[in-house]
Design a protein with these regions (language model features):
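Conserved ATP-binding subdomain of kinase catalytic cores across diverse folds
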Residues: 4-139, 157, 179-182, 222-223
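Regulatory N- and C-terminal appendages and interdomain linkers associated
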Residues: 4, 8, 206-322
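Glycine- and acidic
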Residues: 43-49, 136-145, 204-212, 241-246
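Catalytic activation segment of kinase domains across protein kinase-like and atypical kinase folds
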Residues: 91, 164-169, 173-232
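Beta-strand segments within the central parallel beta-sheet cores of soluble alpha/beta enzyme folds
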Residues: 77-81, 173-176, 242-246
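A generic secondary-structure signal for well-formed alpha-helical elements
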Residues: 69-73, 80, 129, 133, ...
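Phosphate/ATP-binding catalytic cores across multiple sugar-kinase/actin-like superfamilies
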Residues: 151-162
Length: 322
């Protein structure tokens, strides 16, 4: 897998994961089963491919939290101790994570073949993903265009859901942008505590590229990289293909804002979205930033305030306001 951030890298994939296969589950959905931390892989880049117990448990807890919050995500089937010692900044017990996903194909998977100009492989990969995730498109004349449009809409919805629960991914490169539009790779991620629009938790993100407020900007950039790999599938005429994908990408912000408007209205207790609820949400976020109020705690206290009819419960979140 490639993993575009500021430059193209040939093999920036998951250096410690092995895809075992897939299985049709009881709900009729086919899911991949992957081991993370099992040892060296083609993408290890000199690493040992092992995982310490800390990062494994973190991914288990956060991915399951995201699932139960209703956010599309890979899931954790099990945590296994390997009996080995893993040496990083400290020595810790070795562990493996059994991870499941509807697909582990990322934008970086398409880039891997594109950088080698392996167009036949790109076509096969696109057809595979259409057949697997969007079988209703298989016989459509414009299936590749529609496939890309669905990914853009899915990613816009996903990032809106991240923002609605205060989730900061931390490493939104193309290798971590899932074609199935699920949250994948829980590395330097975190949930927002005191609200800051530009909050960053990743120690490697010195310039705030993946800051909370930038997530809705990075996602369409990543999707543009996907578009570049499939232009030839959309039209033999490159100029025509560019116009098609530009139009689809232009709608990312509209789709993101529409999703976030609905989610933010619900967080405020309204059944339906209106411009007034959107304005209220924005004003509340501004107050939270000035008052350094806890993101989740503030919204939780809204409910408690109504139940107990005590405004001080809500106002206590803003004790730092002058």
């Amino acid at each position: 897998l490639v993993g575009s951030e500021m430059c193209i890298r040939d093999r920036l994939g998951d250096g410690r994961s092995v895809l075992l296969g897939d299985k049709i589950c009881q709900d009729g959905v086919r899911r991949d089963i992957q081991l993370k931390g099992s040892g060296k892989t083609y993408f290890s880049r000199g690493g040992d491919g092992r995982a310490g117990i800390g990062p494994v448990i973190r991914e288990y807890l956060i991915s399951e939290s995201m699932h139960h919050l209703g956010v599309p995500t890979t899931r954790s089937l099990a945590v296994l101790l390997t009996g080995e010692k893993v040496v990083r900044a400290e020595v810790s017990p070795g562990a493996m994570l059994a991870r499941v996903a509807t697909s582990h194909v990322r934008v970086g998977t398409f880039e891997f073949f594109a950088i080698r100009n392996q167009k036949d492989h790109i076509r096969k990969l696109a057809d595979f993903m259409i057949e697997r995730s969007h079988p209703d498109l298989s016989d459509k004349k414009e299936k590749y265009e529609l496939f890309f449009e669905r990914i853009v809409k899915g990613q816009a919805s996903l990032v809106a859901q991240w923002n609605s629960v205060g989730f900061i991914h931390g490493v939104m490169n193309t290798d971590n942008t899932s074609i199935s539009c699920e949250t994948i790779d829980y590395g330097p991620c975190a949930f927002m505590d005191s609200y800051e629009a530009n909050k960053v938790f990743s120690s490697i993100d010195q310039y705030g590229r993946y800051a909370f407020s930038n997530q809705s900007r990075v996602a369409p950039w990543n999707l543009s990289r996907l578009a570049e790999t499939i232009l030839f599938l959309i039209s033999k005429n490159t100029s025509d293909a560019i116009k098609v994908v530009e139009k689809i990408l232009f709608d990312f912000d509209k789709n993101f804002n529409a999703s976030l408007d609905i989610l933010s209205s619900r967080k405020l207790g309204f059944k339906n979205y209106s411009k007034k609820t959107s304005s209220l949400y924005s004003e509340l976020l501004n107050l939270m930033e000035v008052g350094k109020a806890d993101f989740t705690g503030t919204f939780k206290s809204l409910k408690e305030t109504l139940i107990k009819e005590d405004n001080t419960i809500f106002l206590n979140n803003f004790r730092n306001l002058d």
